[in-house]
Amino acid sequence: MTGMGEFWSTSHTTGGNSSYLESLFESYLDDPASVPTDWRNYFDSLNNESVSNGKDISHAEVVKRFKNKSPILQKNNLELINKQYEVFKLIDAYRQKGHFKANLDPLKLEQPNVTDELSYTFYDLDENDLNKSFNFNSSKDSKNSSLQDIIEFLETVYCSSVGYEFKHISEKEIIDWFIEKLERDKLPNSQLSNEEKIYILKRLGSAEGLAKFLSSRYPGMKRFGIEGAESLIPLVDSLIQNCGISGAEQICFGMAHRGRLNLLVNVLGKPPTELFSEFEEDFELTGDNTGDVKYHLGVSSNILTPNGEVHVSLNNNPSHLEIVDPVIIGSVRARQDRLGDTDREKVVPILIHGDASFSGQGVVMETLQMSQTRAYGVGGTIHIIVNNQIGFTTSNKSDARSTPVSYTHLRAHETT
């Protein structure tokens, strides 16, 4: 057991005196003569092996050194955080408004309405930041890239030949799904195989070939050709195939005049000879004919897909361009109910609109207003808007509508 003499001899170094001892030791390090002789002798007698490099450093000096450095570090960190925040705002601007800059006008009739928000200079960013590394939080894939690489990536995704508009949707899960598909899965950069390219080329060739033949063989006759919108044929063909792969059993099409004859022959399989006979002056009506013009008539057929046959029908359509919309929706709902399709997945409605009529006909909005109701909902409709830039009211947008695009009213229903 330690004797009381030893205890008293070391009592001045107990923990209760630590603050006093540290202050005294700080003074000793600054100037040994500033402390009493007995304390100076005590500090001199300390084993220097316990002192780093044989010489201790004043804690006050260390604190002062870091204190002077702290504002610089804080300033640099704050600047980096602010820059990163500006980059996030730029990324979000591309996701929200990149479609305005997309190359959608091959004839260059209108200048794209490019907002300043798609320029990095709109934010607190400059040329010196282009080579700096920033975080690009792309859905589940978080990585660092230079600002220059981030901008080039966003331009490729959102400002190429396809525009994507989805940030008006209120459900975060849907927005995240789009971001993941476009950015993480790099959907816009998907490469087609040579077989797919050849197949699309053949479909385009069939569409253009029929259009040119009808134009030269029956000049001056109304036919509402597909010229300028030939890509509609491979698009519709792809939709039918993918609907079949997804388990759809029936597809109901509704469309107006533009490109209808081409769709009848090149997608739905109407015999060309039957179409040509309708152009001839000696065409005779039979009991199956209504006497209506050829570009009002419909047809139905079974089309083979990788998942089996899909029954596809194109309804008759009158001259009132969009009046077929609620007819198709009603037909689809009746078919779904008859099949017991409560998930609304076996019968798919596809409506093909003209650019002018889609924004001008009130029946479009009336049909949309019923889309989410319990009695008339069909689980969603695929809308295709055709604008070959030579149709009615397309020469000057200012004379056609009061919105930048014809589908602006779809945003009210959170449609993509």
Over which residues does each language-model region extend?
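Generic, well-ordered alpha-helical scaffold segments in large soluble proteins
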Residues: 23, 27, 31, 42-45, ...
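Hydrophobic alpha-helical scaffolding
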Residues: 11-14, 29, 76-80, 140-144, ...
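Subset of Sec-pathway N-terminal targeting signals
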Residues: 3-53
